Amino acid sequence: MNWAKELFKVEKPIIGMLHLGALPGDPRYKYENSLDKLVKLARKDLLALIEGGVDGVLISNEFSFPYQRKMDFITVAAMARIIGEIKSDISIPFGVDAISDGSATLELACAVDADFCRGTFSGVYVGDGGLYDNDFSKLLRRKTELHLDKLKMLYFINPESDRNLDTRSLSEIAKSTVFKAGADGLCVSANAAGEDVDDNLLKLVKDAVAETLVLANTGCKPSTIKEKLKFADAAVVGTYFKEDGKLQDENGNNVRIDSNRVKKLMDVVYQIRKDLE
């Protein structure tokens, strides 16, 4: 867990989500909106997150609905282009998540020299997209081949919107994932983005893997972040940071980051850190 303090330079780091809009090949992509426009919007959101004071940023293809288990080349290529063009503006640690495709996430992290990545790297799940499993034995061997020794991997252990077919308790899954995969961090989520993650689940996982970073992955806002960080070591915040706290507008378009909302949550976090001193 010491790696997080070394990387983010603070206790209880807050990672802000940078949601990319629909990309070429995605059903929601509008071809009149060029990649140049997506780059411009991504840069705007990035600067709003940094201005608001987050400790890290996680870039994902949030609007590539429906998500692919085996991502098309164009999707990860578009992500790499956007990240490459805004990278000079990234002044804090950053990570990537090519949603639902662990291999694409790892390859992308290598290509853009990310500090960390997040994904569904382990387990067997069922959801709207059907049945899928994840083979971290191949993934970790690929990580070795790519010499990604410094890349930190944050594992979902109860992915949003899908059900884990593993009948073991979440605490057993947490222990096993850390032991077998050497997970650098475990992300604990609610059933969907923006929904409040159960404090009891956070405590359960943290008690099971006391020496591993545990992140509150959904539903964090100023009124709840103090309680979440009693059990979690860090938090990933996405929906709350957006204008009016909405993931998307009435037309299904990506909503922009509001730096004032970022500052509001971070002010609470600064006080939490003072209380820890």
Regions found by a protein language model. Give the residues of each.
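Hydrophobic faces of well-ordered beta-strands that scaffold small-molecule active sites
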Residues: 14-18, 57-59, 94-97, 117-119, ...
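Glycine-rich, proline-tolerant flexible connector loops at the mouths of alpha/beta enzymes
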Residues: 50-78, 124-129, 183-196, 245-250
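Conserved, mostly hydrophobic/aromatic
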Residues: 16, 49, 57, 117, ...
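Alpha-helix-loop-beta-strand connector modules within alpha/beta enzyme cores
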Residues: 10-11, 16-17, 68-96, 134-154, ...
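Conserved anion-binding
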Residues: 23, 104, 110-185
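Catalytic cores of alpha/beta
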Residues: 96, 101-114, 172-174, 208-237
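Active-site mouth loops of central-metabolism enzymes
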Residues: 19-44, 94-101, 155-171, 220-221
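Short loop-to-alpha-helix "cap/lid" segments that border enzyme active sites
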Residues: 168-185, 193-211
